[in-house]
Amino acid sequence: MGKSKVLIIGGTGYLGRRLVKASLAQGHETYILHRPEIGVDIDKVEMLISFKMQGAHLVSGSFKDFNSLVEAVKLVDVVISAISGVHIRSHQILLQLKLVEAIKEAGNVKRFLPSEFGMDPAKFMDTAMEPGKVTLDEKMVVRKAIEKAGIPFTYVSANCFAGYFLGGLCQFGKILPSRDFVIIHGDGNKKAIYNNEDDIATYAIKTINDPRTLNKTIYISPPKNILSQREVVQTWEKLIGKELQKITLSKEDFLASVKELEYAQQVGLSHYHDVNYQGCLTSFEIGDEEEASKLYPEVKYTSVEEYLKRYV
């Protein structure tokens, strides 16, 4: 497949910076939207300069200046948005509606990847827990705008980010694995799908000029990474040579604890409920033509066990 000109929005963020690296690594001419809102955030500025030194182009543009967005979009074939959808950080999913309008105005984009990268909102609109459902609702608003505008798209469903889920052994609010005890959600046997964020970026970039992924949802669900919480914990125990004390948290007690939290945390915990208590991520079948590790067998993805080794 040929190389593309790729514009990445949110290129200094948690996933965005990985998308930039993956785009450069795969040989695409990579542009990063440099927003004035970055201000004097020296870490982000230094990251942008680092990417520039690696060959990326910095393009000035702002969601407050529609024409600047249009001009930035006109430079490329592919637009990827990595705008944050996490309420405990900055939640800006609907900001992408301006980007959709800019892409429509420019008229030259061959593929748009909006900020998805989690669970597929189309699959869980009727079952997602409130208030976490707001994230899915907003992603569907963006999807409908994309499709109404006739913009070629790929939606990437990446399931669970390893850094957030595996690092804390699937416990909310923990990003380092314990060597003493672990809270098990329910019976701990609901399976979920965990992906290294670098792998997510690699797969996402693979899709951008692949005709097989045009106007489709692609799921990153590699077989070795479909595990229950208990299986994740067992993998960790094997690595450290020690069995953890296990404390069971019932669904009822979990829901009661959620009510005591601030709204942003309630949103995040709603997603944990859907994943850990409902098993939503493995509640439907995925065809080989929709699954990233089947589409791109040349990518050596990081297994759960390999990922957890960094914490030993």
Curated annotation (Swiss-Prot):
Temperature-activity profile: Optimum temperature is 30 degrees Celsius.
Superkingdom of the source species: Eukaryota
GO terms (molecular function) for this protein are: lariciresinol reductase activity; pinoresinol reductase activity
Q: Which UniProt keywords apply?
A: NADP, Oxidoreductase
Q: Does the keyword Transcription regulation apply?
A: no
Q: Which InterPro entries match?
A: NAD(P)-bd_dom_sf (IPR036291), NmrA-like (IPR008030), NmrA-type/Isoflavone_red_sf (IPR050608), PCBER-like (IPR045312)
| Cross-referenced Pfam families | NmrA
Recorded catalytic reaction(s): these are:
(+)-lariciresinol + NADP(+) = (+)-pinoresinol + NADPH + H(+); (-)-secoisolariciresinol + NADP(+) = (+)-lariciresinol + NADPH + H(+)
- As annotated in Swiss-Prot or TrEMBL, what is the tissue specificity of this protein? Expressed in young stems, young roots and petioles. In stems, expressed in radial parenchyma cells and in the cambial cells of developing secondary xylem.
Describe the pH dependence. Optimum pH is 7.4.
One of this protein's GO BP terms?
A: lignan biosynthetic process
Q: Does the keyword Membrane apply?
A: no
Q: Which residues bind substrate?
A: H271
The residues responsible for catalysis, as annotated, are K139 (proton acceptor)
Sites binding NADP(+) sit at G10, G11, T12, G13, Y14, L15, G16, R35, K44, R143
EC number(s) given by UniProt: 1.23.1.2, 1.23.1.1
**Role noted for this protein:** Reductase involved in lignan biosynthesis. Catalyzes the enantioselective sequential conversion of (+)-pinoresinol into (+)-lariciresinol and of (+)-lariciresinol into (-)-secoisolariciresinol. Abstracts the 4R-hydride from the NADPH cofactor during catalysis.
| UniProt similarity note | Belongs to the NmrA-type oxidoreductase family. Isoflavone reductase subfamily.
Subunit details: Dimer.
Know the name of this protein? Bifunctional pinoresinol-lariciresinol reductase
Species this chain originates from = Forsythia intermedia
